[in-house]
């Protein structure tokens, strides 16, 4: 009799464990490929970045600034990841990407897309008061192969100069997320070029349906700012890279990773990571 009573408890306990799988997500500005980075060249940084990703075991993560050759280098070292995202200059492979990488043995790619942070989001274009560069947001719709749970993952890189562009980017991204994802679980990552006091950050964080993962944990591992400028800005506490989630997720941990090698940093940004769980 006792065994009969215990079996349903064990069964439902196993179901609960399976449906509550945690994911390690992250956002990481890789720093673009440029020969002017004397002492911090991509050829030296790439294997360190790959080792960092492997060690911290990111399941899904958004990248910023990566050129196609940089993303190819990461995938070559870490073939367990699949990459999705278009180049911001031509919608194919030219220019910086806001690419998303995910473990191909853990997730099935159901859909994906890109849109530009501009008044003409369907084609490569400058937005509002931005004068330097096209800005792009990439997204994927993933299904966890084991649990069958589905979620959307969006990743963006905001303009570094135009205040109007950053404000409007937040509006556009939230509109697109609502249109594409509806009430489904969503993770939004990116380099927002603004800390938690910026109005474009606040527009998302106070929206009522997307919350900063940092604010959802009791003990965030926040030991620095996220832009280190290859070491010349390490005393800053300003975090401009963020992870947002909808209420479908429980945030278990949040951390800013300050890994270094031989006294150097693998990028001019520190990656932000969060352990999250679909409710």
Question: What function would you assign to each model-found segment?
Answer:
Residues 2, 18-77, 88-96, 171, ...:
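N-terminal, active-site-proximal structural segment of metallo-dependent hydrolase catalytic domains
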Residues 4-15:
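Sec-dependent N-terminal signal peptides
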Residues 22-35, 98, 110-115, 149-159:
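Active-site-proximal beta-strand elements of phosphoester/diester hydrolases
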Residues 31, 67, 157-159, 192-193, ...:
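Catalytic metal-binding/acid-base residues of hydrolase active sites
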Residues 60-150, 255-256:
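Structured beta-strand-rich core segments of catalytic domains in phosphoester-bond hydrolases
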Residues 62-64, 85-86, 187-191, 212-215:
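Active-site neighborhood of phospho(di)ester-bond hydrolases with catalytic His/Asp-centered motifs
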Residues 106, 164, 168, 175-186, ...:
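Metal-dependent phosphoester-hydrolase catalytic domains
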């Amino acid at each position: 009799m006792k065994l009969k009573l215990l079996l349903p408890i064990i069964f439902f306990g196993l179901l609960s464990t399976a449906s509550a799988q945690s994911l390690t997500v992250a956002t990481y500005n890789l720093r673009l490929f440029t020969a002017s980075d004397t002492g911090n060249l991509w050829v030296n940084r790439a294997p360190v970045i790959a080792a960092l990703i492997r060690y911290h075991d990111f399941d899904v993560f958004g990248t910023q600034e990566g050129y196609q050759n940089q993303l190819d280098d990461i995938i070559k070292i870490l073939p367990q990841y699949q990459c999705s995202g278009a180049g911001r200059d031509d919608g194919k492979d030219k220019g910086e990407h806001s690419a998303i990488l995910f473990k191909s043995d853990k997730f099935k790619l159901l859909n994906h897309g890109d849109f530009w942070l501009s008044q003409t989001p369907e084609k490569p274009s400058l937005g509002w008061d931005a004068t330097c560069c096209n800005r792009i947001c990439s997204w994927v719709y993933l299904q966890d192969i084991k649990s069958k749970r589905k979620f959307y993952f969006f990743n963006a890189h905001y303009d570094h100069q135009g205040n109007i562009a950053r404000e409007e980017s937040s509006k556009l991204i939230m509109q697109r997320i609502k249109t594409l994802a509806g009430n489904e679980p969503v993770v939004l990552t990116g380099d927002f070029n603004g800390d938690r006091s910026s109005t474009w950050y606040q527009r998302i964080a106070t929206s009522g349906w997307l919350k900063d993962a940092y604010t959802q944990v009791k003990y965030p591992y926040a030991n620095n700012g996220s832009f280190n400028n290859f070491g010349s800005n390490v005393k800053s506490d300003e975090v401009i890279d963020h992870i947002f989630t909808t209420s479908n997720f429980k945030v278990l941990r949040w951390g800013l990773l300050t890994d270094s090698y031989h006294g150097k940093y693998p990028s001019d940004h520190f990656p932000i990571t969060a352990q999250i769980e679909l409710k």
